Amino acid sequence: MIFSRSARSIFPLLPPYGAHDPQGGRAVPLQPDDITPYMGLRARLSQIWMNRWTILLLLVLVRVLIAIASLNTNMDSARREALSACTSVESMGSAMASMPHYSARGINELTASGVETAVSALKTMLTLVVSGVEELIVFFIKMMYQTYLCLITMAVRGTVDVGVGLLKDASDFLNSTIKSIGEGISDATQTFEDGLNKFVDGINIVGSVFGGDEVPDLDLSSFIEDLENAQLPSSIDDGLDKLNDSVPTFDEVSEFVENIIRTPFDEVKKLINESMGTFTFDRDTLPVPAKKQLSFCKGSDGIDSFFNNVSDIAETAKKVFIAVLVIAAVLVCFPMAWQEIRRWRAQKERSQLVRKEAHDPLDVVYIVSRPYSAAAGIKAASRFSNSRRQILVRWVIAYATSPSALFVLSLAIAGLFACLCQYLLLRAVEEAVPELSAEVGAFADKVVASLDNTSAEWALSANSAIGDINTELNDKVFGWVNSTTTGVNDTLNTFVDKTTGVLNDTFGGTLLYDPLKDVFDCLIGLKIAGIQRGLTWVHDNAHIDFPELSNDTFSRGAAESLSDDNSSESFLSDAGASTSNKITEVVFRVTSAIESGIATEALISGAILLIWFLNLLFGLIRALSLFRSHDRNRGDGGPGPAANLDPNDGFSDVPLTAIPNPHTTAHSAADSQSRSQPVPEYEPPSRNFASAGPPAAVTAQTTYEDEKLGFAGQRRNALKVSVIDARASSYPEFGDEKR
């Protein structure tokens, strides 16, 4: 491949070596400290501090410092807004804490009217209950003893009627029977009497003969007449008739019991009307809490400490970033210096390739000027056996690591690193936000605590007044209820005693007493015992107890709003607010703005990085498209065989000690004679090297691939360094260093 350019286009007006030298331009060996037209190692090392990564790190530091300054400005503004919002919250909290003062009057009126209504309803209910119980007890007692009276009447009169009938039948039977017996005895005794009298008359006759007394005659007629006239007395059933007529009516007992029972009930109703008829709750006994003025913004350690903490974080981050990035910028100079030393040595070694005719001159320039990119390409290309593909791989790496591409890549990396530094700063600030949220929660807790204290004090006084009402009603009204139940129990006992006395007086000593006593116990005694147990229960449980007011009457709603899952329900939040309160919303707005800025910068840096990847993709697409094509032979339209070419063909020998003559041609023989003095020049090779790769013709119709990719990968000794000693100074060199 021929590269032909005029000497002026390559070295425009170069000053000759030694033009300033008193030696007259004579070529002399140069020492390491001599002046050269190119930068030596010392000169390169003197510019290490201006290397790409140091400058980028310093730019990142500048961006971070700008971000910190912007953060401080935004936080100062947020502090003012937060204090303003805190004042609003303080006013709201004071209003909330003073709500018991305004609502207590209404609640007191509601409580008093509720008690009055309850007492009025209680009065009506008690009057109805007392009247109902009174009538029920009277009705029950009347029903019991009237039932018992019916049973007694039925039993006694039935028994008396049966007894009287039996006695009448027995009397009639006995009267008729005795008369018949008397008549029969009269007839029998008359015959006996007549015979006996005859016998006696005979004896009297004999006795008179002998001078004795006469035997009296037997006369039974008077006795027989008495027997015939004998009958049961008519008064035999008078006792039963008297018993039948003496069955008790219990009218006296009924009247007595009814009067005793109604007396306590009438007294209770009278007391109920007197004590509860015009009941009025004393409103003055219910307290009215005083107004509250809360203060938690002035000198608030929470808000001030948060923003001071954020300022401290920003200041600390500023110092850390300055220290770390400056140290990193300084430390990166050391590997860059070492890299520059290695680059210098590699350039010196590879500069020998310029003297070798087997190399593509542009490839040699690329290898010498960009040793690391070239080395990376050579290493990557070593994985392929095909020389064409080796060239394409080297070309892709050279395309992706060109100065423009590396500038884009380094700019993208620096931008992303700056975003990372800003993100770390933002995370440090966001970690401090919960402290502010906790402090705002403490504000709400202070309001709720104030409401709790006020509500508890008010409830204590109000409950005391309600307790006094309970005591008064229990003593005045239900005390008489207790007395009434005791009196009714005593009345029932008196009723039982009176009834038992009547039964004892009426049927005592008779066969009916025990059966009637058992019937009384069964019908009335057991029922009265049950009534007495019920009255005893009423006596033990008759009292009123109005419910007390809760201690959290005024604070329950505020406390529930804080514990609610929906933070927008908090009394410190506006309706529809997305944050828990106004104060933290200010900080969230600042952090959101910073986060949005970081995201924007990250997108920009990502777009720049994408440009580099697109550039790499273009190179890969180009290389892959050439991977599939093959070199053609001459018979297939390919180039002809390579000729033995002079490596200097297409180049002009440019004298380094004199200004070249623009009128001479590149191949003029007089050019070498016009030189004032001989200068060191590269010796042409003693023999030509045959091409080891695919043939390439040096013609005007050179292919596009040859012009763009070169021949470095197509020659056997393309990457070999000549073992021939390069031009060296006669003076010792210290580390091959050049200034």
Curated annotation (Swiss-Prot):
Residue intervals on the Extracellular side: 1-52, 157-320, 418-600
This protein's UniProt keywords: Cell membrane, Conjugation, Glycoprotein, Membrane, Transmembrane, Transmembrane helix
Top-level taxon: Eukaryota
Polar residues bias spans: 662-677
Glycan attachment sites: 175, 244, 273, 309, 453, 482, 489, 504, 551, 566
GO CC list: mating projection tip; plasma membrane
Region (Disordered): 634-697
Keyword Acyltransferase belongs to the record: no
Single GO BP term: plasma membrane fusion involved in cytogamy
UniProt topology in membrane: Multi-pass membrane protein
Predominant location category: membrane
UniProt entry tagged with the keyword Transmembrane: yes
InterPro entries associated with the record: PRM1 (IPR026777)
Subcellular location: Cell membrane
Ranges that cross the membrane: 53-73, 136-156, 321-341, 395-417, 601-621
Topological domain spans for side Cytoplasmic: 74-135, 342-394, 622-739
Entry function: Involved in cell fusion during mating by stabilizing the plasma membrane fusion event.
Family of this protein: Belongs to the PRM1 family.
Protein name: Plasma membrane fusion protein prm1
